[in-house]
Amino acid sequence: MKHNRLAIAALAPVLILVGCSTPLERRQASGGFDYLEQPAPTPLVVPAGLDAPRLSREFDIPKLGDNAERDVVGPRLDVRPPLQVLPLAPGTRIQDGVDSITVLVESNQDDIDLAQEIHDTLLKFLDDKSINVARDDSGVIVTDWIENEEVIGKSWFRDKVYQIRQRYEFDTVVKDHGRSGSITIELVDHEEGLDGVDDSIVLTDADRRRYAIDMLNNAIAYMNFERQQRQATQELLNGRGIKTELGFDSDENTAFVAEASFDQVWRRMDKVLPLLGFQVRDLDQQLATYFVDYEPDGGFWASLWGDNDELPLEEGPYQIRLEPMGERTAITLMDNEANPLPTETVTQMYNRFAELLQKESRDLQ
C-alpha cells in the first residue's frame, strides 16, 4: 500500500490539463498564424525587351476599405459567421437603415396594451433565464450581471474556469397611437477571463453587436412563444359555446347576459346575427354597437322552419349594443333610435338567441 501511494505521488507533478478551447480561441482560425510573418510579395520584374506574362487576377486579395479595422488580423480576427436579428414573433420586423440593434413590434390584439405587453414579456423572459433586473424605469430595463462559467481544463488540484460576465440594456418605445413600437438592445458591460477578469481583452464593435443580437433573438423567440400561446388560448375561447341568460344591463333594461368577455361576444356576434336574420350594415367597437337590418327571409331559422318561426320583429333597422359587466357581457336590443325593445319582445327572442350562442363556433359555419 505504501508503494501505491508513492506511485501516485510521483505521477502528480506530471499531470497535464485536459480540456477544450476557451471562448476566445473558438472565434479564431485554426492552424496557426504564421502567415502574419510572411513578407509582402514583390512584384515580378520583367527585363527590358521581354513581354510581361499574362497574370490572372482571380485570386487577388482586394484592398481594404477606408473604414476597415486594419489591426484585426491573426488571433483578433473573428472567423465565426455573422448573426442577424431574427424577427420570428408575429408582428415583428427588422428596422432598416439604422446602426442600432432594433426590432419593430406591432400590436396583434386590440385588447392588449402594446407597451405593457413588451414590458411584461421582457421581464418574464429575463425571469425565465434566471436573470435579475438592476433597473426598470420609463421603458428602460437594465439587467444585473449575467455570469456564465465553463470548465476548460481539469486537474487533481483545481479546475480551470473561463468566466464571462455581461449586462444588457433593453430600451422600449411605443408610439402615441399605441399600435407599434420597438425594442433596442445594447451590451453595456462585459468582462471575461480565465480564473479572473482579463483586462487585456477588449471587445470589438462586432463582438458587442454579436452578443447583443444573440440576446435580442432569444427575447424575440420568447415573445413568439407568448403570442402563440395567447392566440391559441383565444381561439379556443372564441370557439366555445357561450352560455346566456335573461337579465338586465346597467340601465336596468331587459337584456341577454352572456357568460363571456366582451371581446369573445363581440367576435361571436358576426356569426350569430346573420343566422337570426340580421344583416350587419355597420359596426363600431368603440360604441360597442352593431347596426343591423332585420330581414327574416335571409335568416337561418326562416330557411329551416319557415315563416312561422321568425323573430317577433318587424323588418327594418335595429341596434344591438354590448356592455362589459366584469367577466360577463350584456346584450341589449334596441330600435333604430337606440330605444330598448320591450321586455316581452326580448323574452320571446331569448330561446333562439341563446341556442345559437351556446353552439360552438365550428357549428355556426
From Swiss-Prot:
GO BP, one annotated term: protein insertion into membrane
Annotated InterPro entries: BamC (IPR014524), BamC_C (IPR042268), NlpB/DapX (IPR010653)
Lipid attachment, kind N-palmitoyl cysteine: C20
Family membership noted in the UniProt record: Belongs to the BamC family.
Keyword DNA repair among record annotations: no
Function description: Part of the outer membrane protein assembly complex, which is involved in assembly and insertion of beta-barrel proteins into the outer membrane.
Quaternary organization: Part of the Bam complex.
Subcellular locations according to the entry: Cell outer membrane
Gene that encodes it: bamC
GO cellular component: cell outer membrane
Lineage, highest ranks first: Bacteria, Pseudomonadati, Pseudomonadota, Gammaproteobacteria, Alteromonadales
Pfam families given in the database record: Lipoprotein_18
Covalent lipid sites (S-diacylglycerol cysteine): C20
Membrane topology: Lipid-anchor
Disulfide bonds: none
Major place of residence: membrane
Signal sequence region: 1-19
Protein's name according to its UniProt entry: Outer membrane protein assembly factor BamC
Keywords: Cell outer membrane, Lipoprotein, Membrane, Palmitate, Signal
Naturally occurring in which organism (per UniProt): Ferrimonas balearica (strain DSM 9799 / CCM 4581 / KCTC 23876 / PAT)
